Amino acid sequence: MVVPKNHLYDPDVQLIKSRLSKLPASMLAKLNAKHIKIKLIDGPITSLPEFAYLKGQVPRGWEKTNKTWDDVPGIGGSETVAIRIGYSDYGKGHGSVNLELHETAHSLDSIVYMRISQTESFKKIWKSECLNLFGENQYFTNYPEEYFAEAFAMYYLNDTTKSELKKKAPLTYTFFQNLQ
């Protein structure tokens, strides 16, 4: 994990580290083996050289928000996961239950598990449970990779979100229970 020197002891940074440390050791080892870096930043994600090309661009699913990647507090899916410090919680510039878990899940999905969200077996689960879990939220009902990332975040965030996942999407819950 890469943390700005002026934020090493920031309580928000400590909470991010704590939440990510709840992931199974085998999963953390796979992130490390694939050289996936989690960068905590104190400015826009587009300030990082690897994401500068996104400046002024509108993210998929954000077309009606008047927001660009400059406003989005996190990104995952590549060898770099970028998380803006202080934006972890729902409603802080995003609609996820937890930013760092959601964005890390994208890199796990695309790199570690070789796009597991696009497999027929996962898509079958997604199609059968996405409406029950997320209602008509098109971000999760249209994109299996977003469903994967958000359900992953629910599984690992806390007992309340994990219980909600188990109740509303038992197949998804079992999928993550078995994912190492």
What name fits each language-model region?
Residues 1-19, 29-180:
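Active-site-flanking segments in enzyme catalytic domains
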